[in-house]
Amino acid sequence: MSRRGTAEEKTAKSDPIYRNRLVNMLVNRILKHGKKSLAYQIIYRAMKKIQQKTETNPLSVLRQAIRGVTPDIAVKARRVGGSTHQVPIEIGSTQGKALAIRWLLGASRKRPGRNMAFKLSSELVDAAKGSGDAIRKKEETHRMAEANXAFAHFR
């Protein structure tokens, strides 16, 4: 048994303008080469575009998009005997949000468009409506987990 203490789970800080943890998580994931001010700029421009497109609170659109993309279950490769099985595992809320943010950013990076703020705003609006690549990724993950429900006992 380890004598070391368990690490405290860090809570995400909130951003200066919206005072929201989700926005800060998004900023930290979009961050490249330590340029945090640029990441904030991209997020705030995307939020402004969401405000213009939907004429609703951009924070509620962001929450709805992340709630829509957050997976309940995922598959994890597990080697049993000589073969590798895709074992379905349940995902906690924090990990689910992190996955959702990663999928949203990945889908927006793949989108054709002028700049990242435009692409991110479009992806967030689509995800809030229930369409888009990030939603497709979640559904695909759920299908994989459902198909491999027979290997659930390998957990």
Swiss-Prot record:
<dbReference type="InterPro" id="IPR005717">
    <property type="entry name" value="Ribosomal_uS7_bac/org-type"/>
</dbReference>
<dbReference type="InterPro" id="IPR000235">
    <property type="entry name" value="Ribosomal_uS7"/>
</dbReference>
<keyword id="KW-0689">Ribosomal protein</keyword>
<dbReference type="InterPro" id="IPR036823">
    <property type="entry name" value="Ribosomal_uS7_dom_sf"/>
</dbReference>
<keyword id="KW-0694">RNA-binding</keyword>
<dbReference type="GO" id="GO:0019843">
    <property type="term" value="F:rRNA binding"/>
</dbReference>
<dbReference type="GO" id="GO:0006412">
    <property type="term" value="P:translation"/>
</dbReference>
<comment type="subunit">
    <text>Part of the 30S ribosomal subunit.</text>
</comment>
<keyword id="KW-0687">Ribonucleoprotein</keyword>
<dbReference type="GO" id="GO:0009507">
    <property type="term" value="C:chloroplast"/>
</dbReference>
<dbReference type="InterPro" id="IPR020606">
    <property type="entry name" value="Ribosomal_uS7_CS"/>
</dbReference>
<dbReference type="GO" id="GO:0003735">
    <property type="term" value="F:structural constituent of ribosome"/>
</dbReference>
<protein>
    <recommendedName>
        <fullName>Small ribosomal subunit protein uS7c</fullName>
    </recommendedName>
</protein>
<comment type="similarity">
    <text>Belongs to the universal ribosomal protein uS7 family.</text>
</comment>
<keyword id="KW-0934">Plastid</keyword>
<dbReference type="Pfam" id="PF00177">
    <property type="entry name" value="Ribosomal_S7"/>
</dbReference>
<keyword id="KW-0699">rRNA-binding</keyword>
<dbReference type="InterPro" id="IPR023798">
    <property type="entry name" value="Ribosomal_uS7_dom"/>
</dbReference>
<dbReference type="GO" id="GO:0015935">
    <property type="term" value="C:small ribosomal subunit"/>
</dbReference>
<keyword id="KW-0150">Chloroplast</keyword>
<comment type="function">
    <text>One of the primary rRNA binding proteins, it binds directly to 16S rRNA where it nucleates assembly of the head domain of the 30S subunit.</text>
</comment>
